[in-house]
């Protein structure tokens, strides 16, 4: 038996974000895994499932929801806790796939993992998939690209990705908070930030383009100089998260040149 494991980029909440290649891959899947965090509202998992279902005309795909194991932080270094966390998630994937393969006569199984944005930008899913491949014999991995939150952000605001001849950094909120603004960098894109880490930057000459729920009916856009608009972003983010129980957001930071 061979297993084809697809990490499928599905954009950010709108089926129109899904590429033709991703749609064809979804249709070809026998099993699609949908993860959700413990105590998380089902809406975010349902959103992923509904995006996938919009490309499936017959009930030929089995959807399996699972609770994503929690990452254990106390008494562990960050990297070690992430490694253990990936091991736990991989074991969950393996158990689900094994159970499915034991119940089917198929010799070739296509398993899909829908990923927000583009799977190439989130190394966790790739590392987890590699663990699955090492555990289950005759397993292959393929990434199916999707529209990333950064692409949707610059499109929503109608701004360029970069400045002419200037460098760009894509980082996480945790690293922005820990390391600050790197020398020689003019533009920063921040993902996976639950703390509005731009508030920890000491430089006041920074402009921000912040977006939440890109492509969804709740899409929210705020832009302005960080000292003037930062508190509004924090308040808006907290309100949106409280209302929906979850949030997907991203932002661009750029240093201002004062005359």
Question: Where are the predicted features?
Answer:
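Flexible, charged surface loops at secondary-structure boundaries
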Residues: 1-2, 24-28, 105-106, 164, ...
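Class I S-adenosyl-L-methionine
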Residues: 2-139, 223, 229, 248-258
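A contiguous loop/helix-start segment that scaffolds small-molecule binding in enzyme catalytic cores
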Residues: 5, 182-259
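General beta-strand structural signal in soluble alpha/beta enzymes
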Residues: 34, 113-115, 143-146, 163, ...
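Short gly/pro/ser/thr-enriched loop/turn and capping motifs at secondary-structure boundaries
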Residues: 39-42, 148-151, 216-218
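A generic structural motif
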Residues: 63-68, 143-146, 209-217
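A polyampholytic, Gly/Pro-enriched intrinsically disordered region
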Residues: 81-92, 159-172, 228-243
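Class I SAM-dependent methyltransferase SAM-binding "motif I" and its flanking Rossmann-like core
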Residues: 117-184, 241-244, 257
